[in-house]
């Protein structure tokens, strides 16, 4: 498994991103009193959600288009389809040939990427600010009409299939725990299927299915456009209307039922990995619903348990007992606690020495976790967690040429119809009390709400051959 910070950039990422040659202002550390992100939000008649957040600190602009279709609700019997379609979006559009979108952005001094996540697929560019119109024209061009043919589909099926072989089937800890935990912890198919994709499903995708998928989900009324950086608001609005205004809305099907029943008993899964050099253990707890008081409390519990060398799990497992040298995990292993919109897990995983029993590792983890369920947390620990989360949150806003902030604004527009809630987050976390931490931990950190995966290496003489 990649460390969480690296996975965010690498998972489902296109390999052509070039180095970012400029910076964005950092929002990290302790922001000044009254810190405020400028947000203007409106919708076009065709339903496109538009978020504008000007910042003239650096002469760059970040443009992101988020479609409300991730791998969570991809078609049954077509696992991996959302990811496959992400690749198809770079195979040409009405006025741009195959891979010309990439060349256009890079030739204008920019970077670009696309990714598939639980609840959205996104595409973004960071460009010099005088190239804003270029980015908007290009994104609208492929929203208007995708150039899809049998040759492109077969080519990308091969590319995605190879990714599955390299990243999952033939890699140590290939799907552990970022694929394995959701599949084991959840019972609803939408949350529990193999989202990276089964090779058989990927190879079975038909051209007509790709066209239908595009016509259904890649529509303005199923998307959010966010622009962050150095731009004139009035001019940006004109560009948005000019290029996205004519795009026709589609009849988007309602979201399926994603709910999970309350888990009552602990689940334990045993897994063998012939390529793993060491055993590993992962735990995952079902999260509260988004935007509830308990949700914000879990954000702080994540800081207490997992984030940094002062985290409770690291101190107990690494510093005190010497069972591991690192603890990975967090809320939403493929993003963060803000950019998803369905059932989610707070997860942690460790790799440990073969001489140690898995039960002993789990007991050590419980030794760090259980005190949060037994009495109100120490005020000093809670305050430190609030500072850590605040610093991390504002640092993320300045990442990748404004991508971090753009990601939050687009997610809040897409899922909550309220991107301005970015300015209310700090207050929500500040309202969390020791009593709320205790209440939340009692319900959500109980063993009955937990799934445990025990991964053991296979003996070398019984290892299975890698898939070709």
Question: Language model features by range: what are they?
Answer:
Residues 81-89, 301:
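Active-site His/Glu-centered metal-binding helix of metallohydrolases
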Residues 32-58:
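N- or domain-start disorder-to-order transition segments that initiate the globular core
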Residues 51-53, 58-76, 80-84, 98-143, ...:
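M16 family metallopeptidases and their MPP-like homologs
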Residues 21-23, 28:
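Boundary at the C-terminal end of the N-terminal hydrophobic targeting segment
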Residues 1-7:
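N-terminal secretory signal peptides that target proteins for export/translocation
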């Amino acid at each position: 498994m990649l460390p969480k910070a690296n996975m965010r950039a690498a998972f489902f990422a296109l390999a052509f991103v070039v180095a970012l040659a400029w910076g964005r202002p950092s929002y990290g550390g302790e922001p000044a009193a009254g810190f405020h992100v400028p947000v203007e939000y409106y919708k076009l008649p065709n339903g496109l959600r538009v978020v504008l957040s000007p910042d003239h600190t650096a002469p760059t602009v970040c443009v992101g288009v988020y479609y409300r279709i991730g791998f969570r609700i991809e078609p049954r019997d077509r696992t991996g389809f959302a990811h496959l379609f992400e690749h198809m979006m770079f195979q040409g559009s009405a006025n741009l040939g195959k891979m010309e979108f990439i060349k256009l952005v890079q030739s204008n001094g920019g970077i670009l990427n696309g990714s598939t996540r639980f609840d959205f697929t996104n595409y973004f560019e960071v460009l010099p600010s005088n190239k804003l119109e270029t980015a908007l024209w290009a994104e609208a061009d492929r929203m208007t009409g995708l150039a899809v043919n049998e040759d492109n589909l077969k080519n990308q099926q091969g590319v995605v299939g190879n990714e599955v072989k390299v990243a999952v089937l033939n890699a140590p800890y290939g799907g552990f725990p970022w694929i394995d935990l959701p599949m084991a912890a959840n019972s609803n198919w939408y949350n529990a299927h193999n989202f990276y994709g089964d090779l058989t499903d990927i190879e079975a995708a038909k051209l007509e299915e790709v066209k239908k998928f595009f016509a259904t989900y890649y529509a303005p009324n199923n998307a959010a456009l966010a622009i962050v950086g150095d731009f004139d608001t009035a001019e940006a609005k004109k560009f948005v209307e000019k290029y996205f205004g004519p795009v026709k809305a589609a009849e988007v099907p309602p979201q399926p039922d994603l709910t999970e029943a309350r888990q009552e008993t602990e689940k334990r899964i045993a897994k063998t990995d012939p390529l793993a050099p060491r055993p590993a253990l992962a735990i995952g707890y079902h999260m509260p619903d988004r935007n509830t008081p308990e949700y914000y409390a879990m954000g702080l519990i994540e800081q207490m348990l997992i984030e940094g060398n002062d985290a409770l799990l690291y101190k107990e497992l690494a510093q005190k007992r010497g069972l591991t040298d690192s603890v990975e995990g967090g809320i939403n292993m493929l993003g963060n606690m803000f950019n998803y919109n369905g059932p989610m897990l707070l997860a942690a995983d460790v790799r440990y020495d073969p001489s140690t029993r898995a039960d002993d590792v789990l007991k050590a983890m419980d030794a760090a976790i259980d005190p949060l369920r037994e009495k109100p947390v120490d005020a000093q620990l809670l305050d430190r967690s609030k500072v850590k989360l605040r610093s991390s949150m504002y640092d993320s806003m300045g990442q990748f040429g404004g991508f971090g902030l753009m990601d939050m604004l687009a997610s809040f527009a897409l899922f909550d119809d309220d991107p301005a809630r970015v300015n209310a987050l700090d207050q929500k976390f500040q309202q969390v009390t020791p009593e709320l931490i205790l209440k939340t931990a009692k319900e959500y950190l109980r063993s009955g709400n937990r799934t445990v995966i025990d991964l053991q290496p296979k003996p070398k003489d019984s290892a299975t051959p890698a898939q070709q």
